[in-house]
Amino acid sequence: MSENIDEPFVTDELRKLASIATDMQMTGKMRSHAVDQLGEIGSHEALLVLLNLVANDKLNVEERDLALKRARDIVKKGR
C-alpha cells in the first residue's frame, strides 16, 4: 500500500485547527475561521474533528452549530 506523502502535514494541520477551534483565549471569529478551514479540508479525518467539536460542551452553541453545519457539508459532498 502506498503511503500518502501529505498525510503527516494534514494530521498536523487538523490538530492545529482543532486546537484553535477549542482555545477559549482566541476570539470567536478566529475559532469560527478554524472550523471553516476544517470544513474546507473536507477529509474523513476533518469530519471526525468537526464531530468532536460538535460534542464539546465547552464551546458555545453557535460554534457547535457551525461545526455541525460544516460536518454536514462534508457528508453531502461524499454522496
Question: In which residue ranges do the predicted regions lie?
Answer:
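Alpha-helical propensity feature that highlights long, continuous alpha-helices across diverse contexts
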Residues: 35, 51-54
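Structural detector for internal amphipathic alpha-helices that build alpha-solenoid repeat scaffolds
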Residues: 1-10, 19, 29-43, 61-77
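Short linear motifs at secondary-structure transitions and domain/linker junctions
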Residues: 14, 25-29
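Buried hydrophobic core positions in alpha-solenoid tandem helical repeats
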Residues: 14-18, 49-51
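Short, charge-rich amphipathic alpha-helical segments embedded
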Residues: 43-49
